[in-house]
UniProtKB/Swiss-Prot annotation:
Subcellular location: Nucleus; Chromosome
Gene inactivation effect: Multivulva phenotype in combination with loss of function of class A synMuv genes lin-8, lin-38, lin-56 and lin15A and with the class B synMuv gene hpl-2. Reduction of brood size and defects in the development of germ cells. Loss of function results in suppression of mat-3(ku233) mutant vulval phenotype.
Name assigned to this protein: Protein lin-61
SUPFAM superfamilies: Tudor/PWWP/MBT
Quaternary structure (record): Interacts preferentially with histone H3 that is dimethylated or trimethylated at 'Lys-9'.
Native organism: Caenorhabditis elegans
């Protein structure tokens, strides 16, 4: 391996003259008014930069009050050995609001009027690499966490850790991806000169932020942000297992190695291997095995299942899986399964059309196995053949026999829930009261007074509804182990709004209402157990995440924890007003660590508006 390292490094060291660096730039304005800042590179005014890089061009305009944080590229030239950011500023951070031009110089910010320029050398943000995947133009519009990750390096923001969330991948990597772990990664310094050979080196994880890690190359100062599910990240010794003869993979350090080793590669390699790799915790082969399993899904495109009608919750319809993305599935009602003319897709998001998007997690309360409606006597809107098919399934289950499914049916076993303790289940009674986040609402920022209306035959399922004259009309089936039901008194205890029953007059008090209705509360041990305090403490105000909008579930957005209410977090979608905030249980599959979308090639919606 030593010869390969020296040969490869010697071959390419002389062909690449500089390495790109990122500068985090903080611009402060003395005046308490919204100001405008336009940043242009040297190329804009015809000045000659000593090593022109056509990829580093363009300009951007930003608006903010008091302060803007952004980043720009610079070069580290081996010949000159210095860092150099570059750019023109046009700004109106002045007493009279008139625009001033300011050319940035490393030594001084004089002449900037009320503007102050502060620079920080930042780590490189590496885009996720997906081998053998076609490019998707939709992903050109996806939002990236680059700016916030650079702010994290300055201690100005943070993220909810992966281990705080409910399971959101089909494979769990929490135990192997940790700070201090050493792994193999691709060195892209050689890409232009090494078409048929992949060059790798070793790096150590310094910080973990969601599915992004801040890593540093062994034996170099270079740091970079990498998605752990990128095809650029490997367990240690992966190269030897993937390419035993090392015909297609070689090891070589990044070009920006520590200066004292640039002319002594033998000592450099020995120091890296003996001093920083041998005996250290490394990313195991199980990591690579786990990544390979991510492409294997429990379900398949074309399978049919039963889907609750979100606009008429007393009805179930037949739907097909159109796309699969990790645990999330795009499902829709198709002409193939519907007994009448399909509703207009503009009025019904669950109906298939060329652009239909109805994305839900595989554990969503909206979906049921084939035969659920027949087993439980629930209203089913389907073709005659399907109804007859599911009636046979229901009869087989009733007789204790194995049902005969079609090959494309999603079965009860595929959507199985955890068993319920029979002793606890006996405590459940029709009429018992609880508090509910309405999963069919257009707003998810309060709780409602609700009741158990009836039992389903399928174990653990109930028909529930919000108290009031429309309780039956708006009722729906749900498994007792869910993220929407909470015990009586939860809203008051955790400072949330409790919506009283429709047509209720006066001030609502639970004790008075229960006495008036001659009702009792659903016992505490029927609800999901409260997570440990250690886990709840990982959800702090100001931490960032990705969240699926429960009103329009095809959209996953960058978001921030605004407040914490026991096991519920109030989430604000970045750039949106607080009226659009939504409450999520910490076990919800609709909240995700940062980096989930890019890891699954799913579009992360940009914030509605930028202020940096």
């Amino acid at each position: 391996m030593l010869k390969l390292v020296i040969l490869c490094f010697a071959l390419f060291y002389n062909t690449v003259s500089s390495t790109r660096f990122l500068f985090g730039v903080e611009v402060k304005c003395d005046f308490d008014e919204v100001f405008q800042l336009t940043v242009s590179h040297w190329e804009d005014d015809g000045n000659t930069f000593w090593d022109r890089d056509e990829d580093i061009t363009g300009r951007m305009t930003m608006f903010a009050r008091k302060k803007i944080f952004f980043y720009q590229d610079g070069h580290h030239g081996f010949e000159f050995g210095k860092l150099e950011p570059y750019g023109w500023f046009l700004h109106n951070c002045t007493k009279n609001g008139n625009f001033r031009e300011y050319r940035h110089g490393l030594s001084s910010t004089s002449g900037s009027n009320g503007l102050e320029y502060i620079e920080y050398t930042m780590s490189e943000f590496l885009k996720i690499v997906r081998a053998n995947k076609k490019s998707d133009r939709k992903l050109d519009k996806t939002y990236l966490w680059e700016s916030y990750l650079h702010q994290f390096e300055k201690g100005k923001t943070s993220f909810i850790p992966v281990e705080a969330f409910n399971r959101n991948l089909t494979v769990n990597f929490n135990e192997c991806v940790k700070e201090g772990v050493i792994f193999e990664t691709v060195v892209h310094d050689y890409d232009k000169n090494c078409d048929s050979i992949q060059v790798r080196w070793f790096a150590r994880i310094e910080k973990v932020c969601g599915y992004r890690v801040l890593a540093q190359f062994i034996g170099a100062d270079t740091k970079f942000w990498l998605n752990i599910l990128s095809d650029d990240m490997f367990g240690l010794a992966n190269a030897a297992m993937s390419d035993p003869n090392m015909d297609k993979i070689v090891y070589a350090p990044p070009l920006a190695i520590n200066e004292e080793y640039q002319n002594d590669m033998v000592n450099y390699v020995n120091n890296c291997i003996d001093g920083e790799i041998v005996g250290q915790t490394s990313l195991s082969p199980k990591f690579d095995e786990g990544k390979a399993l991510l492409s294997k899904h429990r379900f398949k495109v074309g399978q049919r299942l039963e889907l609750l009608n979100y606009s008429n919750s007393t009805e179930i319809r037949v739907a097909r899986i159109q796309e699969i993305c990790g645990r999330r599935m795009n499902v829709s009602i198709t002409k193939k399964d519907f007994p009448e003319s399909l509703p207009d897709a503009d009025d019904d998001r669950q109906v298939f059309s060329s652009g239909s998007q109805y994305w839900i997690d595989e554990g969503s309360f909206f979906i049921f196995p084939v035969g659920f409606a027949a087993v439980n006597g629930y209203q089913l809107n389907a073709k005659k053949e399907y109804i007859e098919h599911t009636n046979k399934i229901a009869q087989a289950i009733k007789n204790g026999e194995n049902p005969r499914y079609d090959s494309d049916d999603v079965t009860f076993d595929q959507l199985a829930k955890d068993p319920i303790d029979p002793m606890i289940w006996r405590k459940v009674k029709v009429g018992q009261k609880f508090e509910l986040i309405d999963p069919l609402a257009q707003q998810f920022n309060n709780l409602h007074v609700a009741s158990i209306l009836k039992f389903c035959k399928t174990e653990g399922y109930l028909i529930v509804g919000m108290d009031g004259p429309d309780a039956l009309e708006d009722s729906f089936p749900i498994h007792i182990n869910n993220t929407f039901m909470f015990p009586v008194g939860y809203a008051e205890k955790y400072n949330l709004e409790l919506v009283p029953p429709d047509e209720f007059k006066g001030t609502f008090r639970w004790d008075e209402y229960l006495e008036k209705e001659s009702a009792e509360t659903l016992p505490l041990d029927l609800f999901k157990p409260m997570p440990s305090q250690e886990r709840l403490d990982k959800f702090k105000v100001g931490l960032r995440l990705e969240a699926a909008d429960m009103c329009e579930n095809q959209f996953i957005c960058p978001a921030t924890v605004k407040s914490v209410h026991g096991r519920l977090i109030n989430v604000n979608f970045d750039g949106w007003d607080e009226e659009f905030d939504e409450l999520y249980d910490v076990d919800s599959h609709d909240i995700l660590p940062i980096g989930w979308c890019e890891a699954h090639s799913y579009v992360l919606q940009p914030p509605k508006k930028y202020n940096y």
